[in-house]
């Protein structure tokens, strides 16, 4: 065991004693320069292009940036346009306006009371109280559970009234109302009071509450597509066109006022809109292909229209213009993919942001070994299904990181920062420890995991001698004689 671990083991026997930073950016291992730039970019709202191989912390940096930006202050809604329904309006509400509306809506909910606290006539007419025996039950019960009589007697009683009441109750026919309106004296004037059924309770609405309801009903109907209380981090890796840019759902009734759904109700925001005032993270951005130009347009205009993407859909005729899309773009790619990033998009990032080359190794120092221990503790804590690791086992993980830096990156006396695969090795060792019933991941568990956790190409070479030999031996004789790629039409004659 190295000197570093001898000193450290005297104080901490395993990785459970290692404190995990609360700051998300401090959990990124070995990318100090990138972390500093990311903090500046978050504060100044600059774009980022992270370049490097998989597993070096690109997504962690992007996600951590969302903790350093202010909370969203705007909610985006689409409002019905009575004159031209296919062109809904955009409405932007500030946080203060949204909170005020919520308070107003809460004030229109009225007072919830127990049916026994309501006037007897109200409880009977709403179906809570049996008019014969006075027993209270659910308004969904047509027959009183206490006396087995219809809870509500029909208003017009003929010679066969009782018979009709019994038959109606037997078939679930109820005469109770959903709402009862009464008047009461309030000072020098009469006040209208409305009693409504509310599950097994009664909602009471006074005149002031009813007036607030009327004011709300006069407002144009709207739909919130980007709520105020949203996650400022939006992941759009591998997103389709509709997921990225939004869409308008199809209506089989063509938006018919009576049968269909109005256009504004079918509008769906895309990732560029959901990331408004937040971070839009796109890993492997070159996989978006031509969609990159739409990202560029949104970055330039800070708005992007929502329209139906399917020309065969009823939503194709609907368009919402100038939907806000003011986001911080954090794009990531591998070094080999740099030529495939749209040139104007990259220019836009450089003109209002930074390009960062991620490191793949760091010096093998005591300080960096401590960071490795932090990484091991983080991986175990995030997994939640494996035990912590002894210092002897952790030393093997660090030595494996040193070995990979030498083999992959040709760097001596350095530690690899391609940590995703090391995380897999830690989990494999943890699974072995769990299978054995160990309370901690021991040195032997890591040694066994290292033997198992090797690339499949290495296993193939060991088993078959070479990849070419493996390819040739994969198919049986019958498959070689009749292989799909060598078929011609005569095979079916």
From Swiss-Prot:
Key word Protein biosynthesis present: no
Top-level EC class: hydrolase
E.C. numbers: 3.4.21.-
Binding-site list for ATP: 52-59
GO biological process: proteolysis; regulation of DNA-templated transcription
Keyword terms of this UniProt record: ATP-binding, Hydrolase, Nucleotide-binding, Protease, Serine protease
GO terms of molecular function: ATP binding; ATP hydrolysis activity; serine-type peptidase activity
Pfam families from the UniProt entry: Mg_chelatase, Sigma54_activat
SUPFAM superfamilies given in the database record: P-loop containing nucleoside triphosphate hydrolases (SSF52540)
Signal peptide: none
Family classification: Belongs to the peptidase S16 family.
Protein name stated in the entry: Putative lon protease homolog
Organism from which the protein derives: Thermoplasma acidophilum (strain ATCC 25905 / DSM 1728 / JCM 9062 / NBRC 15155 / AMRC-C165)
Lineage: Archaea, Methanobacteriati, Thermoplasmatota, Thermoplasmata, Thermoplasmatales
